[in-house]
Amino acid sequence: MRIYALVFLAASPAFAGDGTCDELWFTRNAIFHGAGYCFSSPLGQALFGNEGCTTKSPELTAAQSARLDRVKAAEEGCVIDPSRTSLDIPDLAIRRRLTVLPIRSESESGCIGWKGGPLSLRTGTSHSAETLFTLEPDDVVLFSHESEQAGGEVWDYVQVYDNGVFRKAGWAVIDWGPEVCEGLAG
């Protein structure tokens, strides 16, 4: 089990070179996109396009500004080449559907072999948010993003992998530990 845990973490995005910086770049620019920003870089245009854009100087809400500050703090030291046209984010298609974008944390943990019951993975931090997937028994769950407080609960953005291959992701209120995981990592 310990060897499997090490393989699981080594195959996760935190060890994938610039994957963490790619995630943070996407989240930061998705905030601007949501505020009507018009992108000029090839990367911004490839990921967000400019349809419906309104400005190069968007006015952010207080919530957007606060989230942007958190992303920028996490992004310190990251360098992204804006002439690229893609990012190393395995769950990019899912992130495009999220109502709350996750912010990558500096650490990660894993639940190897989920023993809890089925659990909805949602687009946002509310039980009324759309269910994207269901966490199932035996899933290998990666926790590598900051938790969010919403509705008096703690929500985690979790990613599910199978032999190092990304399978599904979403937001959930999830209590995890030895009682609901075959093994723990991180």
Where are these regions (language model features)?
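SH3/SH3-like beta-barrel superfamily modules
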Residues: 131-180
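C-terminal partner/receptor-binding element of secreted or periplasmic proteins
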Residues: 82-95, 171-186
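Compact alpha-helical subdomains of small soluble proteins
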Residues: 47-100
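N-terminal signal peptide c-region/cleavage motif recognized by signal peptidases
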Residues: 11-13
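Amphipathic alpha-helical packing elements
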Residues: 23-54
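Boundary of Sec targeting at the N-terminus
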Residues: 15-18
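Beta-loop motif signature
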Residues: 98-151
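Sec-dependent signal peptide recognition
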Residues: 1-9
